[in-house]
From Swiss-Prot:
Record's subcellular location: Preautophagosomal structure membrane; Vacuole membrane; Endosome membrane
Gene3D superfamilies xref list: YVTN repeat-like/Quinoprotein amine dehydrogenase
GO biological process, one term: protein transport
Residue span of region Disordered: 266-315
Motif L/FRRG motif boundaries: 226-230
Domain notes for this protein: The N-terminus might form a beta-propeller domain involved in specific binding to phosphatidylinositol 3,5-bisphosphate (PIP2), leading to the association of the protein to the membrane.
Protein's job: The PI(3,5)P2 regulatory complex regulates both the synthesis and turnover of phosphatidylinositol 3,5-bisphosphate (PtdIns(3,5)P2). Necessary for proper vacuole morphology. Plays an important role in osmotically-induced vacuole fragmentation. Required for cytoplasm to vacuole transport (Cvt) vesicle formation, pexophagy and starvation-induced autophagy. Involved in correct atg9 trafficking to the pre-autophagosomal structure. Might also be involved in premeiotic DNA replication.
Protein's membrane topology: Peripheral membrane protein
WD repeats: 1-36, 69-114, 139-182, 185-225, 230-269, 310-356, 368-408
The organism of origin for this protein: Aspergillus niger (strain ATCC MYA-4892 / CBS 513.88 / FGSC A1513)
One Pfam family per UniProt: PROPPIN
UniProt protein name: Autophagy-related protein 18
Amino acid sequence: MSMNFVTFNQDYSYLAVATSKGFRIFTTDPFAKSYETKEGNIAIIEMLFSTSLVALILSPRRLQITNTKRQSTICELTFPTTVLAVKLNRKRLVIVLEDQIYLYDIQTMKLLYTIETSPNPNALCALSPSSDNCYLAYPLPQKAPPSTFQPPAHAPPGTTHVTPTSGEVLIFDTLKLEAINVIEAHRSPLACITLNSDGTLIATASDKGTIIRVFSVPDGRKLYQFRRGSIPSRIYSMSFNTTSTLLCVSSSTETIHLFKLSLQSQSPDATPSSSLTAADRRSSQSSLGQLSDADDRVGDMGSSELASRKHNGTLMGMIRRTSQNVGSTFAAKVGGYLPKGVSEMWEPARDFAWIKLPKSNPGPGANGNNGPLRSVVAMSANTPQVMVVTSDGNFYVFNIDLSKGGEGTLTKQYS
């Protein structure tokens, strides 16, 4: 049996695991199995909060909505190409294909809208759990340039979009069924995006993985900018806590970073601007794009991260926290004298706390992948804890000191 897919529900109270032989659902606090079926090769599973409604991908193009309590199938849908991701909240069901996104009313399963996208093989997409701020975020589609070649009449229609070359995010209102903003988040193409539980914040990371940015939604103001490290890394998972005061980030390194969303770490340009016109917004986004270029370059050549991260929670941790405080204070003072584009190079804040994943042998639910250890992260709604699920079939719980930060402590482990 191999593990195909793993995800938390919208409030992190449940964990769902899709395998080559059925699926399992666990409560996270306490960690315990609440449902299991051993039928079917399940590619993707998504839950609707703590309800018995579960969305399953049983074959590449077939979606099944199931009621686990009644053990009945509510509906089935077949799509023209492979389903790469499924997102849902109490108002909307979102199906992500490589070059299309389908929006459904989850109450009636009526198709509301179809979005044409650029090729999106990694299914980059985020749906807000909120029923009020019901926003969808995905990479801005990039139109294909006009071709001088005239294909024969019998040829299938050519592609209308090309793979994005920059990291722009489109914000779509799934209630009004209209695009409402474009955020120029990164110079490089996007690797990961996530929305908070209220649908008021979005975190973004590019394929370089050195800089993490947080913007307000829907207006797209940049609020925070964090440095994960100076060495490029693939970002696998990002998650806000339920109060949106912390952001947890996992990557192809075995260090998980926690960033504090506080006034001290806000960007200098994070002041409200309620009277922005469309032209003003385009202008501000253009200038942000130029700053993003500088920030991403700095991300590649900035101060080197301690490769070994051999923190023992005492001397090294104290030195690290002290240097962070000095750095942020110095940047704040210098930022007042430097031009904005230059001051932002000083700005990215380091992590507030971090977690080192333990070395472990693949468990019985592992997928057998010999590549980098992939992980999905979430933060408990009730306690200062980080939950981590890894591709080798392990579930970890770490305690975090919210007052001092530093290295998290492993308290529970399940395989």
